Amino acid sequence: MKQFFKVLTRIILIICGGLCLLTPLAFLILANLFKASPSDIKKGNEALKQIFISLDLPPEKVESNGSYQFEGGGLDFYVTFSDDVVNSHPVLKESPNLTKNRLKVYVLNTGDISYHSVEDNLFNHGLSQFLEEEGEKYFRENGKKSHSSYTILTLNDPESMKKGIAFYEKALTLVDIHDNSAIKHIDTVTVKPGKEAELKQLIQDMDEAGLLTQKYQ
């Protein structure tokens, strides 16, 4: 009987040892399954670099570890800028995703990199939404709204994105942004006292530049 238990104990130890070895191996396999290929990461880095260069925001470095997030998917790229570039461009300096000159750009996959995805990570969502809502008011007040469900900023190429950045940076001087990140809510935006007329003119200029599009459902 003692011999039986000795053999049984050895078998259990061998099985446990095997499981201990399999656990990190399984983790490595899963990690690689949720990781972009080196060629995709390289293409993503280059795509982001070229987009920012076309916007006159030349980066020093673009990088990503290529790991897809387990919850929700997607992966992060990090775009590093010089002090001069950050300090001379409010759109960068005031970006919620900028930390120590590094801009985090989240995309669903490397093929999703575009001017729209850059805008989505570069701009403050609260201010973007505020400008779209002000665009709705502008259309309504000027009789331009016709069964529109909502208005969006249309920034999908170098030309429109450059224009959009210029207007966005102007908007930053006309509003106060209240950080709601602590409660995980979109930031609240209010017009600075005495800046109402300038904001209305800004919205009109954005419309005339073709940056506000009415969408229908």
Regions found by a protein language model. Name each.
Residues 1-24:
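N-terminal Sec-pathway targeting helices
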Residues 19-41:
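Membrane-interface motif at the C-terminal end of an N-terminal transmembrane signal
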Residues 33-63, 122, 126-139, 198, ...:
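Short, non-transmembrane alpha-helical segments in secretory-pathway proteins
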Residues 56-106:
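Exposed beta-strand-loop-beta-strand "reactive/processing" segments of non-cytosolic proteins
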Residues 82, 95-97, 128, 157, ...:
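Intrinsically disordered, low-complexity coil/linker segments enriched for acidic/polar
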Residues 109-183:
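Non-cytosolic head/periplasmic domains of membrane-anchored proteins
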Residues 157-158, 177-207, 212, 217:
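Short S/T/G/P-rich N-terminal loop/turn motif that feeds into the first structured element of a domain
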